[in-house]
Amino acid sequence: MPNQSGSNSSNQLLVPGAAQVIDQMKFEIASEFGVNLGAETTSRANGSVGGEITKRLVSFAQQQMGGGVQ
């Protein structure tokens, strides 16, 4: 069953509209890393972008909770 972003992923976003922000973050990070996202891109390159998104989201959440490591 497709989710909001049209994929078949079982991951559900808890905040409406977050998909657009995550997509923007994905393309910004890909640009920083020099990765051209797409079907021809290696799993390793795509994974590096996803991993960086996760790191930044965790860091942001930690800062919001007041216990963030800078």
Swiss-Prot record:
Transmembrane segments: none annotated. The keyword Ubl conjugation does not apply. The keyword DNA repair does not apply. The record marks 28-29 as: Cleavage. It comes from the Bacteria. Pfam families: SASP. SASP are degraded in the first minutes of spore germination and provide amino acids for both new protein synthesis and metabolism. GO terms for molecular function: double-stranded DNA binding. Gene3D superfamilies: Small, acid-soluble spore protein, alpha/beta type-like. PROSITE patterns: SASP_1, SASP_2. This is Small, acid-soluble spore protein 1. Keywords: DNA-binding, Sporulation. Belongs to the alpha/beta-type SASP family. It comes from Geobacillus stearothermophilus (Bacillus stearothermophilus). SASP are bound to spore DNA. They are double-stranded DNA-binding proteins that cause DNA to change to an a-like conformation. They protect the DNA backbone from chemical and enzymatic cleavage and are thus involved in dormant spore's high resistance to UV light. GO terms for biological process: DNA topological change; sporulation resulting in formation of a cellular spore.
